[in-house]
Amino acid sequence: MLMLFGGSFNPPHIGHRIIAEIAYDEFNPDRFLIVPSKNPPHKSIDFIANFDKRYSWCERVFFEHYFEVSDIENKLPSPSYTIRTIEYLSNFDKNINLLIGEDSLKNFHKWYKWEEILKKVKLVVYPRYFEEKNSYSVDFDYVKLESPIVEISSTYIRQRIKKGKTVKGLIDDKIFEEVLKEYS
């Protein structure tokens, strides 16, 4: 089984790391892919560090042998639609789990070709907010990852840096100085 954990990782932070570790421990996938988006369709390109930088950060944050940081979305057409990544990966592995946050689940029905995604993967959802399943506009079949709610976001980190506030402990030391420089 392949676990796919995609995102802008703008920047990758301790919350991403915690979620990935728990998902790996819980599901023990054959492969665990960390996939930074090249050009996420729902994000403004003005606020995103370039792909090579985010890819490099992910390589240093997710350094264990059981994580594999993939540049696949850098090779696929833009924008970086999840379905394109899944279709490419399904050439090699038909058993794909897609790891997403509960906040993404709420708007999943707005994703490009979301119904096709559901036919090709099993959704694994990590908790982000205290919301009931029935608050989603579409009923999805998914597995909920048993993990603590990690309320750290890349947006929060970027905002703190812009205000000159500390983000110590929220970002891996291996990328700390680069992240500060990028978003200051």
UniProtKB/Swiss-Prot annotation:
It catalyses: nicotinate beta-D-ribonucleotide + ATP + H(+) = deamido-NAD(+) + diphosphate. Pathway: Cofactor biosynthesis; NAD(+) biosynthesis; deamido-NAD(+) from nicotinate D-ribonucleotide: step 1/1. It comes from the Bacteria. Its EC number is 2.7.7.18. The keyword Nucleotide-binding applies. Keywords: ATP-binding, NAD, Nucleotide-binding, Nucleotidyltransferase, Pyridine nucleotide biosynthesis, Transferase. GO terms for molecular function: ATP binding; nicotinate-nucleotide adenylyltransferase activity. One of its GO terms (biological process) is NAD biosynthetic process. It is an enzyme of class 2 (transferase). InterPro entries: Cyt_trans-like, NadD/NMNAT, Rossmann-like_a/b/a_fold. Catalyzes the reversible adenylation of nicotinate mononucleotide (NaMN) to nicotinic acid adenine dinucleotide (NaAD). HAMAP family: NaMN_adenylyltr. PANTHER family: NICOTINATE-NUCLEOTIDE ADENYLYLTRANSFERASE-RELATED, PHOSPHOPANTETHEINE ADENYLYLTRANSFERASE. Belongs to the NadD family. This is Probable nicotinate-nucleotide adenylyltransferase. It comes from Petrotoga mobilis (strain DSM 10674 / SJ95).
